Structure formats: C-alpha cells, structure tokens
Amino acid sequence: MKRTNSKIDLTLDYHAHVLPGCDHGSDSVETSRKQLAMAAAARVRTVCATPHFYPHRESIPSFLQRREASARLLRENLTADAPQLQLGAEVLICDGMERLDGLPRLCRGETNELLLEMPFYQWPEAIWDTLYALCERRDIEIVLAHAERYSPEAIEQLIRDNVALQLNSECLTRPLHRKRYLTWIKNGSVKYLGSDIHMLGNGYRAWEICRNLLRE
C-alpha cells in the first residue's frame, strides 16, 4: 500500500554518529556534547545514535556491549536540556544477513525499524536478494539510510516496492537533484531526515534550511 503521509518530524534526527568512541563519529564526550548542543539549537529534541555496525566484522552482542558503554558514558555527562538520546545502528548490508540472529536488537529504540546502509557501487543480484529477504521479515522494518547517495533508478524501484527511505538533511541544501528529493518526500516515501553528523562537520546548519523547505 502506498504511503500518503509526507510530513516529516524535524524534532527527530534519525541518523547521527554521536556516541563517543563507538565509531568515527565522535572522538570524545566533549565532541558528543557539542554535537548534541548543536542539535538542540536546531530545535531537535530527539537524536537517534546510529553507530556503524558491520556484520562481517563484529558480533551483535559485542556491538551492543560497546554501544551501551558509550551511551552510558555520554548520558552521565549530558545536561538536562540536551536532546533525548535513542539508540540504534547503521547496519551495513551483507550477503545472507537475513539469516542473522538478533537483528531486532539493532532497531531504533523500542521500534522495529532497522536503518540499513547499502553499498555505494552497483548492487549485485545477491545484495538485492538479501534486501528483499530482509523486507520480508516480520520482526523488522527496513529504513534505507541516506537514500540520496544511491542510484536513483535503484531507489525508484524501492519506492515502488514501498521501502521506507531516510535522507540526509544536507542533500536538500543543494539545488542539484533537490526536486527529486522533494518529490520523494511529497509522495511519502521519505520517512525520516538525519544529520548523519560525524565529528562537528557542518553541524546542523542544514536543518533550518530543511525546516523552511518543508514549511515546518
């Protein structure tokens, strides 16, 4: 069934690398505090921490242990006015990972949404097969990370197949291809925006531009 709700919650940053030392997104608690302060200034109330998870390199229990330790350290050092922190993961697709036990433990917070990263080369048949096998699982819902980075033809196919998309806010600040992304948003295919912040980068400067474009 085709989505019709095109409204995006800009108080939620769905994709952010803010856990200190958990991946290359933040090198310290101080960096993470600055990241979250910038999020708060952009009127973001909830940040979903989505450190990279590579199934071919690490087990799910090992990853979750590292993530929890990093999140605990950060929470102990946050001020009361900091955005709420949710835990998730940016999971790199691997051939056959639909058979991996424990995938729901990588979903965002208490939801069944799994943020899935695809390869940046042309997807071979085996990856397509894995993607569709993941979509058929009843215990998770796939959300495709930074969909603007992949082949438009592949994304259009996934839109027809009703796979939910996440866009990085930065892509809406550039005129090139913006019309395409706004069309995806208007037709309800884009479920979330994310900063995909690594270190301090450009912070959340794109967030206000997105807010104006989407008339929030």
Model regions and ranges:
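Non-catalytic positions within long, well-ordered alpha-helices that form the structural scaffold/packing
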Residues: A40, E136, I185-K186
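Short loop-to-alpha-helix "cap/lid" segments that border enzyme active sites
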Residues: P175-I185
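An N-terminally biased module of ancient metal coordination in phosphate/nucleic-acid-related enzymes
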Residues: M1-A82
